[in-house]
């Protein structure tokens, strides 16, 4: 991509992805196979907590969100791999970027909606019309994991804006963010 300088070599990037990508596939496989046992354990934990400490069911919801996250990561990684394999031609970089944006616009709501449903979260968006037609600067204060999804769900998707992100370099350990982030010309910072 034009104008980008990477602080890592191609070998370092491939090495990192050889470590991080399999963890998502193995994680999804393990959680899926053990899901019945994990669900019973989560339900027992939640019932005991509800009866003794009057706490809401949290373990069950976290298990469900964990599985949804892993499934979403695996689907994204597979989609990135397929688009990389089948996107050829003179405008390959541009088409890979567009496909990554489309993948992101399906991934973010696929995590955001279940989070909102399971944790009964409600959001009110004021001034959303201010994002059009762009250019626009969006500042999101990172206080929780959900905050990572908000720009895509609230601004980029509804207004079809291809946002660029400044992302903590440590988030390259999430292969979906790593691969998609590179294709969307985001900047990973220290």
Predicted regions and their residues:
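Membrane-proximal helical "anchor" segments flanking the first transmembrane region
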Residues: 1-133
């Amino acid at each position: 991509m034009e104008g980008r300088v990477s602080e890592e070599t191609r070998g370092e990037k491939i090495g990192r992805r050889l470590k991080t990508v399999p963890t998502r596939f193995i994680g999804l496989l393990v959680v899926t196979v053990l899901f019945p046992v994990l669900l019973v354990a989560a339900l027992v934990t939640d019932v005991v907590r509800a009866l003794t400490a009057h706490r809401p069911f949290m373990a069950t919801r976290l298990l469900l969100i964990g599985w949804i996250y892993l499934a979403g990561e695996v689907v994204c990684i597979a989609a990135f791999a397929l688009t990389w394999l089948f996107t050829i031609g003179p405008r390959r970089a541009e088409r890979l970027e567009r496909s990554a944006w489309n993948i992101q616009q399906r991934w973010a709501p696929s995590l955001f909606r279940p989070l909102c449903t399971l944790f009964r979260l409600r959001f009110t968006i004021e001034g959303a019309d201010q994002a059009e037609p762009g250019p626009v600067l969006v500042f999101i204060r990172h206080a929780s994991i959900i905050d990572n999804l908000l720009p895509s769900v609230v601004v980029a998707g509804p207004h079809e804006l291809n946002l660029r992100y400044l992302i903590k370099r440590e988030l390259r350990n999430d292969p979906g963010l790593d691969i998609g982030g590179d294709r969307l010309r985001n900047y990973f910072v220290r």
